């Protein structure tokens, strides 16, 4: 067998880091192990695995897998031949291997790989060397194995030996095989990691990702799904027949608290082969066997036994050698039994290892096992039969020994499932249905570990098995209890006067005074100071007997002895239960017990008369002494006095922590004597010399300790606290003494502290495991010393009397009981007792007094219990507590108040351990108890979550479903979402349990730990990871309905809001869960949009069938509006109830929903707009439809406010605002269509008004009669219009909503005003011919003549002043009518209405002269050509400017020089215009092109002046030069700003009208400031004007008799003619 160590380090993958979540599987020899899964393209595992290899011709297969939601995919594989792996005891840097895609197979076994991939993995592989084997021993075994291999020349086994050499490459490896196969179980006692440490490594790997210690087997927590056991092959089972994994090691598995290097078997190393086995122990035992045989003269026998140590190799002489071998085995077993000196009754199992070794040798490397190619031959050759016979013989011997011994020892059991061999890192396949109830299986392995860990410390403790020690302690206990110190006769002190100088027996001070100096016992005669009488505790009777015996007073002695006898008889009669308990505890037969009682009584009666001892005292050192010198130091020395013999050490100068290391020998013949050890400060000054003359003690006293000789036994290394002699003493510190006592008859016994430990442990074992069936008795004591009560009254008296008799400190008792309880710390009530015990132990060491300056750490180091021993015990306990707290839900069920109380006490105990480490051990920063508990709680929650995740369906159906449900997939699925609501339900039950049951219990750290909140935080964190990953997978396929995702979203939201939102750790953070569902919510919104549109169409269809009926008597709109917004509101309510806490995601939802609203309402509006004209002929229906549109706007505003109003996302808000504007526009358009539908009837009414108005005659004077006449005429004129309006507006006021009514009134007002302007004020425009001619500006020149003819034919229809006054009054009446006393349109709107303004302006223009109108036109029309842009000015005509800006498509350009001169006297203006040239004329013509320029002055007061000049024409020139000058004279009535020059370029045509090429207008106001300038005017196609200009043009067009007016209209109506080629 070889041990293969593999470390999976890290890997490098090609690709996106997001797509990798990988783990590694290792396969070798049918054993498979798996790492944890790690995300990223450069994962780091750093996990160790160990395998036992029996065939080096195989290989290690390494596969890298990528985790998926449903199935995993392989990234690549590597195959490593085992023969190529190096041997080393140190881990190397590892080697990079390229992953390949396929494996090569040969004979159904992998033999290589092919098809490299771009991925790589770093692996460290090696074969382990024997652990910690000394070099000398390695050389010895190398030599031995070479000898054995040299003997293997037998022909029968030559081929097998050759193969064996291949399998055992080095001697070191062979030695390693011996270690693992022969002594694997026993070596675990020297394992560098204890059982609890082993389990803690598991715990660490789960919680802190720390790597397990080297040479250690740790179960991979995440590998269970890929691991499986391999059964033992049949031939191996044959040789395992009758064997057991636990055989032959019960007595070896001892755990003595005095020897902490011994450890119990590691519980996690459940494999037969422990992980950190030390070879040297097994090797030394083998060496002893060799030494035994080397003393034998027979060389063949020695060779034979050496051969038996090999792996199945035989001696040269075949059968004879085999017989020698059998004999050697028997001799070896006998010699081993003799060496240990144990009787057959004790049945020490150390006889077993050699036979066990033989079994395993044959099992592992027998010929049939190691060489499969030999299997074709007979399985039982002659040599193999000899082997089998030898093994069977040894097994039968062991069977007999076992039958004669303790029946509790395990027998050789037949093989079964437990007999299989497992890989070190393998585990059973756990992919099965977990049992119920909740989390019951979660930490079962850890529970078993605990039972096998610290608990085994009690079950296999040395004191329970060491019969010699138990026998001695049994006697000593009887001795202490038959005549206990607590029941001894007290001294009978009387005041006594000394006649000679007498010294106190206690303090050895002089009894000062003339009389009545002290006290004297009348019985035993001891004398002392009055203050010292309480310090004497020796039994007066016994002391008197001893004294009488020494002085020969036989009669008195006999009386005292009889008194003591009587007392012991009374004691035995009154307290028989005490001695019965002692007998039961030590399992002594009644006969032996009676005999032993007699012996003990006699030893008490003998007292010290027959007692003697040799005492060796080594004064080692002291710590923390008082400083007595002025220098702040002392010069200490020690005096030791036994009886009357006194000795002293040398002086150590200037040291408060002196080291003496001086040894003194004493003989003592009185067991009641005391050893007085006193520490002094040596003074050598004058004062001390004077004191030396006067006093016995001239030096300063530093402290003392008084030791009862009867409390000593064996070898002791003890720290004693220095104590005061009087109240005035200033004492501190402790002294270390090594005391060796050889009591006559008890030369080889353990110290009393060890004996007390034996008594306490055996008593605890008896009361707990035997009498209490595993339960621990909890004392019900009260008071300050209640913590010192460990057992019931009888057992407590036993330990107290023993401690009192033999000087066992109470703190040692407490620590011993604490150690015992640590093996039962999970029993009900025990944690509370342990917590109290440890708190008092802490108080003892940590709470220093004013009289001592020794630190707590030093005081603890001086503990007789052993510092390392107690610290190791606490470390083990601390680890076990962490593991149990990491499964608190299983170990401390919420339904058990008693266990919850134990949980609280367990945390208190953990806190006490932390206090101990901080205050007693004085560690700098021990782990805080609160943090440890918090980590444990998190670890438990992690495990709990994993459990409920893996068993979700089973747990849910068990707890929440009464009826049987069909089988479902065990985990999450992409086909449905059923798994997640169930998981949420289970998570809530866990959090509620933690909040309600565990939080009130684990309340020791209110500021740092709240279990309910931690539970919610951990559960949410783990749930969030899985939920996010699952939804990412769902997003790819989306196999579920969007409604299902929305329902799950609501459940997740509820979970977060209910339990997570208020957690301190998550305060101020935006939750992540809305992001997981964002795409699904948007999908739902997309689908919801289609649903809303369907609702819209359906609602409109129903509305249409019903004739758009009002929804109610008071509602003015129809049902379709209600239908549309019912659906939209329901949809928004769902979005609102999501309560999305992420503003950005909520903004996405709002934007998307705003689009839905917009799409639905716009489609509604489009449908109404499309069908609206068809309904305008009906009276009420158009009003209801407009009401519907208005109601859409009202509901949209409400929805806008519901969606957040001003707080709404800006993009969504802008979208809704834009929608509101669109709806408003639609309503305006509907109102306009509705208003225009009345155009024909209003035209008819207005024509009737015009006819009536045309009949009005008279002047417009201001007399009262005239005013009355005007009012009467106005009423007559309005009557046709008012009759029409009365009927309709009354209906509108009833049917329309107020907003709609105002819009309808506005449209009617517009139509009435425009019609009155068009029909009455500007009647020629009614003629479409005239209108067309004016508006199109006579595109053809021929049409100009038609316009003239038309204007001539049209009769003049100028309104008279009276008619204007009537019409103006009629307008006021109409205005009042539309205002309707405040119920209609506002007066402000009516007054500022552009339609009324236009009408009134037209009326006002009617009364103005032609000059005034022309002046108004020039001043108001500033953008007639090219929007008034493009004219450039230069200083003179020779400087041509850049092209004008803002001019699109000019048809040419004219250059003119303008000079403006104003006469200083008359104020008249003279304008000189020089037409320089025309440039870039754009004109196409087939014939002659003769352009010329026409310049016209436009303005008032020009009727008597020349207004127009024309240049000569230039033939066929598109850039003609003219250089012609013209002069215009202007009056002084107006300034230059009332005039403008209009330049028109025309093509001269003979016999027909000239054609216009382009026009330009230059206002003189631009020249006025300059006076003189060169102008460059771009030519436009026609004159543009606004409404004012058009109105003036219309009015002037009616003045056909006014030449200036006609010329002006013609001038402004001209436009570019159609080109011949276009």
Swiss-Prot record:
Gene3D superfamilies per UniProt: 1.10.357.50, 1.20.58.1100, 3.30.60.20, C2 domain
- This protein's record includes keyword Acetylation: no
Q: How does it sit in the membrane?
A: Peripheral membrane protein
Q: Where is the composition biased (Low complexity)?
A: 307-318
* Coiled-coil intervals: 1210-1231
User: Mostly located where?
Assistant: cytoplasm
The yes or no answer to whether the keyword Chloroplast is present is no
Residues involved in Ca(2+) 1 binding: 629, 635, 681, 683
One Gene Ontology MF term: zinc ion binding
Tissue distribution: Isoform 1 is ubiquitously expressed. Isoform 2 is expressed in brain, predominantly in cerebral cortex, hippocampus and striatum.
Zinc finger boundaries on the chain: Phorbol-ester/DAG-type: 490-540
The UniProt comment on domains reads:
The C2 domains are not involved in calcium-dependent phospholipid binding.
Q: What are the start and end residues of every segment in region (Disordered)?
A: 189-280, 292-357
- Named cofactor requirement(s): Ca(2+)
MHD1 domain spans which residues?
A: 1025-1168
Which InterPro entries does the entry mention? Answer: C1-like_sf, C2_dom, C2_domain_sf, MUN_dom, Munc13_1, Munc13_dom-2, PE/DAG-bd, Unc-13
- Composition-biased stretches, type Basic and acidic residues, lie in 196-205, 292-306, 324-349
Residue numbers of Phosphoserine PTMs = 16, 307, 378
Q: Which GO terms describe its cellular component?
A: calyx of Held; cytosol; early phagosome; glutamatergic synapse; Golgi apparatus; hippocampal mossy fiber to CA3 synapse; membrane; neuromuscular junction
- Name the job this protein performs: Plays a role in vesicle maturation during exocytosis as a target of the diacylglycerol second messenger pathway. Is involved in neurotransmitter release by acting in synaptic vesicle priming prior to vesicle fusion and participates in the activity-depending refilling of readily releasable vesicle pool (RRP). Essential for synaptic vesicle maturation in a subset of excitatory/glutamatergic but not inhibitory/GABA-mediated synapses. In collaboration with UNC13A, facilitates neuronal dense core vesicles fusion as well as controls the location and efficiency of their synaptic release.
Which PANTHER family has this protein been placed in? PROTEIN UNC-13 HOMOLOG (PTHR10480), PROTEIN UNC-13 HOMOLOG B (PTHR10480:SF8)
Tell me which residues make up the MHD2 domain.
Answer: 1275-1417
Assembly with partners or alone: Interacts with RIMS1.
Q: At which positions is Ca(2+) 2 bound?
A: 629, 681, 683, 700
Its name, as the record gives it, is Protein unc-13 homolog B
**What does the UniProt entry say about where the protein is found?**
Cytoplasm; Membrane; Cell membrane; Synapse
């Amino acid at each position: 067998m070889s041990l293969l160590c593999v470390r999976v380090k890290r890997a490098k993958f090609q690709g996106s880091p997001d797509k990798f979540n990988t783990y590694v599987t290792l396969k070798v020899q049918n054993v498979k192990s798996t790492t944890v899964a790690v995300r990223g393209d450069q994962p780091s595992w750093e996990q160790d695995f160990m395998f036992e290899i029996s065939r080096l011709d195989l290989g290690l297969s390494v596969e890298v897998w990528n985790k998926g939601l449903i199935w995993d995919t392989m990234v690549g594989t590597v195959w490593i031949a085992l023969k190529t792996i190096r041997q080393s005891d140190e881990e190397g840097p590892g080697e990079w291997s390229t992953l390949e895609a396929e494996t090569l197979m040969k004979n159904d076994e992998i033999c290589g790989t092919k098809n490299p991939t771009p991925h790589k993995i770093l692996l460290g592989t090696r074969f382990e060397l024997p652990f910690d084997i000394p070099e000398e021993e390695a050389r010895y075994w190398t030599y031995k194995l070479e000898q054995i291999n040299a003997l293997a020349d037998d022909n029968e086994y030559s081929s097998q030996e050759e193969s064996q050499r291949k399998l055992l490459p080095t001697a070191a490896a062979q030695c390693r095989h011996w270690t693992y196969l022969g002594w694997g179980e026993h070596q675990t006692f020297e394992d560098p990691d204890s059982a609890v440490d082993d389990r803690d490594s598991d715990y660490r790997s789960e919680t802190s990702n720390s790597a397990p210690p080297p040479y250690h087997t740790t179960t991979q927590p995440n590998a269970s799904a890929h691991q499986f056991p391999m059964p033992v092959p049949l031939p191996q089972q044959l040789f395992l027949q009758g064997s057991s994994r636990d055989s032959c090691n019960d007595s070896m598995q001892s755990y003595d608290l005095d020897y902490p290097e011994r450890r119990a078997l590691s519980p996690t190393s459940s494999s037969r082969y422990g992980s950190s086995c030390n070879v040297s122990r097994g090797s030394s035992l083998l060496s002893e066997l060799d030494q035994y045989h080397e003393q034998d003269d027979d060389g063949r026998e020695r060779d034979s036994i050496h051969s038996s140590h090999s792996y199945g190799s035989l001696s040269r002489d075949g059968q004879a050698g085999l017989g020698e071998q059998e004999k050697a085995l028997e001799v070896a077993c006998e010699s081993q039994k003799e060496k240990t000196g144990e009787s057959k009754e004790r049945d020490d199992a150390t006889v077993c290892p050699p036979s066990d070794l033989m079994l395993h040798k044959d099992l592992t490397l027998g010929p049939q096992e190691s060489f499969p190619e030999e299997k074709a031959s007979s399985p039982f050759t002659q040599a193999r039969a000899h082997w089998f016979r030898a093994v069977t013989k040894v097994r039968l011997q062991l069977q007999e020994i076992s039958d004669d011994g303790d029946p509790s020892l395990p027998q050789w059991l037949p093989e079964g499932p437990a007999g299989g061999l497992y890989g070190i890192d393998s585990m059973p396949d756990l992919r099965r249905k977990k049992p119920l109830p909740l989390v019951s299986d979660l930490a079962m392995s850890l529970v078993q570990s605990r039972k096998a860990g610290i608990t085994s410390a009690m079950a296999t403790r040395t004191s329970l098995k060491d019969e010699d020690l138990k026998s001695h302690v049994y006697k000593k206990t009887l001795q202490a209890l038959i005549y206990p110190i607590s029941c001894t006769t007290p001294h009978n002190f009387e005041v006594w006067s000394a006649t000679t100088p007498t010294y106190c027996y206690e303090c050895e001070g002089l009894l000062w005074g003339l009389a009545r100096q002290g006290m004297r016992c009348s019985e035993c005669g001891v004398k002392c100071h009055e203050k010292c009488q309480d310090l004497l505790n020796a039994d007066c009777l016994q002391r008197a007997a001893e004294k009488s015996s020494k002085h020969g007073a036989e009669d008195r002695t006999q009386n005292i002895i009889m008194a003591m006898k009587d007392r012991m008889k009374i004691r035995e009669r009154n307290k028989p239960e005490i001695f019965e308990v002692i007998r039961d505890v030590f399992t002594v037969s009644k006969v032996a017990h009676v005999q032993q009682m007699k012996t003990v009584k006699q030893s008490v009666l003998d007292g010290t008369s027959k007692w003697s001892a040799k005492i060796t005292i080594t004064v080692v050192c002291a710590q923390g002494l008082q400083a007595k010198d002025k220098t702040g130091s002392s010069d200490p020395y020690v005096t030791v006095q036994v009886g009357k013999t006194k000795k002293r050490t040398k002086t150590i100068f200037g040291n408060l922590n002196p080291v003496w290391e001086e040894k003194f020998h004493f003989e003592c013949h009185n067991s009641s004597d005391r050893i007085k050890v006193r520490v002094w400060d040596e003074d050598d000054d004058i004062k001390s010399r004077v004191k030396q003359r006067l006093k016995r003690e001239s030096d300063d006293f530093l402290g003392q300790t008084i030791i009862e000789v009867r409390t000593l036994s064996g070898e002791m290394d003890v720290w004693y606290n220095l104590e005061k002699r009087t109240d005035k003493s200033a004492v501190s510190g402790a002294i270390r003494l090594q005391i060796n006592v050889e009591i006559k008859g008890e030369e080889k016994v353990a110290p009393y502290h060890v004996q007390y430990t034996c008594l306490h442990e055996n008593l605890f074992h008896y009361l707990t495991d035997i009498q209490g069936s595993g339960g621990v008795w909890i004392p019900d004591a009260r008071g300050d010393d209640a913590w010192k009560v460990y057992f019931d009254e009888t057992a407590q008296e036993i330990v107290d009397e023993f401690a009192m008799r033999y000087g066992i400190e109470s703190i040692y008792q407490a620590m011993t009981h604490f150690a015992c309880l640590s093996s039962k710390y999970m029993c009900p009530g025990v944690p509370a007792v342990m917590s109290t015990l440890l708190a008092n132990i802490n108080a003892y060491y940590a709470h220093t007094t004013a009289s001592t300056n020794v630190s707590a750490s030093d005081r603890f180091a001086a503990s007789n219990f052993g510092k390392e021993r107690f610290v190791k015990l606490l470390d083990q306990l601390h680890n076990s507590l962490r593991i149990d707290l990491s499964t608190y839900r299983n170990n401390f069920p919420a339904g058990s108040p008693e266990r919850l109380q134990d949980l609280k006490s367990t945390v208190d105990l953990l806190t006490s351990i932390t206090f101990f480490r901080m205050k007693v051990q004085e560690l700098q920063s021990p782990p805080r108890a609160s943090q440890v508990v918090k980590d444990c709680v998190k670890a438990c929650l992690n495990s709990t979550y994993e459990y409920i995740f893996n068993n979700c369906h089973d747990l849910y159906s068990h707890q929440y479903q009464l009826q049987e449900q069909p089988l479902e997939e065990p985990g999450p699925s992409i086909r449905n979402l059923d798994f997640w609501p169930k998981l949420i339900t289970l998570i809530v039950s866990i959090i509620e349990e933690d909040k309600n049951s565990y939080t009130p219990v684990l309340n020791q750290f209110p500021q740092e730990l709240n279990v309910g909140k931690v539970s919610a935080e951990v559960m949410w964190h783990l749930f969030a990871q899985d939920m996010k990953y699952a939804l990412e997978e769902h997003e790819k396929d989306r196999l579920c309905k969007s409604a299902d995702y929305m329902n799950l979203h609501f459940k997740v939201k509820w979970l977060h809001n209910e339990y997570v939102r208020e957690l301190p750790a998550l305060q101020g953070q935006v939750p992540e869960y809305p992001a997981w569902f964002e795409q699904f919510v948007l999908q739902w919104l997309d689908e919801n949009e289609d649903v809303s549109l369907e609702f819209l169409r359906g609602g409109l269809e129903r509305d249409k069938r019903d004739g758009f009926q009002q929804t109610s008597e008071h509602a003015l709109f129809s049902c379709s509006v209600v239908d549309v917004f019912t659906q939209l509101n329901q949809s928004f309510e769902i979005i609102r109830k999501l309560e999305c806490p992420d503003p950005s995601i909520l903004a996405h939802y709002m934007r998307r929903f705003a689009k839905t609203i917009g799409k639905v309402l716009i489609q509604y509006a489009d449908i109404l707009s499309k069908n609206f004209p068809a309904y305008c002929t009906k009276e009420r229906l158009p009003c209801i439809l407009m009401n519907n549109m208005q109601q859409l706007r009202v509901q949209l505003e409400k929805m806008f406010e519901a969606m957040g109003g001003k707080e709404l996302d800006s993009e969504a808000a802008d979208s809704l605002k834009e929608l509101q504007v669109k709806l408003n526009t639609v309503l305006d358009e509907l109102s306009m269509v509705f208003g225009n539908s009345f155009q024909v009837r209003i035209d008819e009414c207005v024509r009737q008004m015009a006819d009536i108005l045309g009949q009005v005659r008279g002047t417009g004077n201001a007399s009262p009669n005239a005013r009355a006449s005007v009012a009467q005429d106005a009423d007559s004129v309005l009557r046709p219009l008012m009759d029409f309006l009365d009927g309709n507006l009354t209906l509108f006021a009833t049917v329309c909503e107020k907003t709609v009514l105002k819009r309808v009134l506005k449209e009617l007002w517009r139509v009435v005003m425009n019609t009155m302007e068009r029909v009455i004020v500007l009647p020629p425009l009614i003629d479409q011919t005239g209108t067309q001619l004016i508006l199109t500006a006579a595109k053809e020149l021929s049409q100009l003549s038609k316009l003239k003819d038309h204007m001539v034919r049209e009769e003049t229809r100028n309104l008279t002043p009276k008619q204007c006054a009537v019409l103006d009054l009629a307008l006021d009446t109409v205005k009042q009518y539309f205002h309707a006393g405040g119920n209609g349109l506002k007066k402000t709107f009516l007054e500022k209405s552009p339609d009324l303004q236009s009408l009134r302006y037209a009326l006002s223009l009617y009364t103005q002269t032609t000059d005034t109108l022309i002046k108004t036109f020039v001043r108001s029309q500033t953008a007639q050509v090219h929007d008034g842009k493009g004219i450039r000015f230069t200083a003179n005509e020779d400087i041509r400017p850049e092209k004008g800006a803002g001019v699109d498509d000019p048809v040419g350009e004219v250059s003119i020089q303008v000079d403006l001169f104003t006469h200083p006297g008359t104020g008249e203006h003279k304008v000189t215009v020089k037409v320089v040239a025309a440039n870039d004329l754009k004109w196409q013509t087939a014939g002659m092109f003769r352009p010329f320029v026409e310049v016209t002055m436009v303005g008032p007061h020009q009727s008597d002046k020349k207004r127009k000049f024309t240049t000569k024409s230039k033939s066929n020139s598109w850039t003609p030069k003219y250089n012609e000058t013209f002069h215009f004279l202007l009056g002084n009535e107006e300034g230059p700003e009332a005039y403008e020059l209009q330049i028109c370029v025309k093509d001269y045509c003979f016999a027909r009208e000239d054609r216009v090429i382009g026009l330009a207008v230059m206002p003189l106001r631009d020249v006025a400031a300059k006076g003189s300038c060169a102008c460059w005017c771009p030519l436009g196609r026609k004159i543009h004007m606004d409404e004012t200009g058009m109105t003036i043009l219309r009015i002037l067009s009616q003045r056909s008799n006014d030449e200036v007016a006609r010329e002006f209209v013609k001038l402004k109506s001209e436009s570019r003619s159609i080109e011949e080629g276009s």
